[in-house]
Amino acid sequence: MDENNGGSSSLPPFLTKTYEMVDDSSSDSVVAWSENNKSFIVKNPAEFSRDLLPRFFKHKNFSSFIRQLNTYGFRKVDPEKWEFLNDDFVRGRPYLMKNIHRRKPVHSHSLVNLQAQNPLTESERRSMEDQIERLKNEKEGLLAELQNQEQERKEFELQVTTLKDRLQHMEQHQKSIVAYVSQVLGKPGLSLNLENHERRKRRFQENSLPPSSSHIEQVEKLESSLTFWENLVSESCEKSGLQSSSMDHDAAESSLSIGDTRPKSSKIDMNSEPPVTVTAPAPKTGVNDDFWEQCLTENPGSTEQQEVQSERRDVGNDNNGNKIGNQRTYWWNSGNVNNITEKAS
């Protein structure tokens, strides 16, 4: 017993305190011997650092305690557990701890001395220098790549934040639109208002239509037709004055000739250009004296010409919004055109 005490007095304090701490049965819930009594296990590292380390070593650093164990040759048995083993650290045999020695740290001057004892050749030295330079370059490249990756990560995070803000703004805008549409659709008179608006819009489009070009063309064609008839009557009057010998012909033949021209005037094609015809020679039969007296005293076609100009002004100034077909009077009816033939009857 005295031998054991004497041997333990020469042991390092760390080993002595560690043995006492592990061998204390009151702390078996925190640290205890393993089943084979050749290693010890730290079951609760947090409580071990908080309660036991301050009591035996006056600090709470569990990592420092592990480094001390490594210094004295302890090794970890199970990577999943805090179990440490040393062949000379056995339960009930504290005297074996005298074989445990602290490892000497390796310092830089020791390496220099080792190199001095074993000098390198020139080729080995150059090879090692090249390898060191290559490793430095690789290190610089890795650091640059790391910086680039870090910069890209920050930019990506900024883009994600911006997109989130835009998404939230769009969601709020969409909600406001949906709420407004729901409020508008909830009004009872909405459908009627929409129908009235569509009807007014259609009426405005119909009223804003320009005058039909086809109607204007028909007016121009009719005007040219009237001019043609005016010239025809004038030539007939002149030729009838020159041929006075033919005035004694039967009036019935003249009436028949004029009657033949009446249906022709009522069948004028308003959609075609007036044909250019050669004036036939005046009939040799006599005509009505009253008819030729009226032709010589009046300006044939003047009344019709004034009516044409008046009607064209009415067509051009029709801006009241009503349909052209409803208010326009087609003055090119056969009745107006046949005025010439009626005078002859």
From Swiss-Prot:
Expression induction or repression: By heat and cold stresses and the herbicide 2,4-dichlorophenoxyacetic acid (2,4-D, auxin analog).
Annotated region of DNA binding: 11-105
InterPro entries: HSF_DNA-bd (IPR000232), WH-like_DNA-bd_sf (IPR036388), WH_DNA-bd_sf (IPR036390)
Tissue: Expressed in roots, seedlings and at lower levels in leaves.
Region (Disordered): 240-329
Gene Ontology MF term list: DNA-binding transcription factor activity; transcription cis-regulatory region binding
Motif segment (AHA2): 289-298
Disulfide linkage: none
SMART domains: HSF (SM00415)
Motif (Nuclear localization signal): 199-203
Compositionally biased intervals (Low complexity): 274-283
Oligomer and partners: Homotrimer.
Name by which UniProt lists this protein: Heat stress transcription factor A-4c
Organism, scientific name: Arabidopsis thaliana (Mouse-ear cress)
Gene name per UniProt: HSFA4C
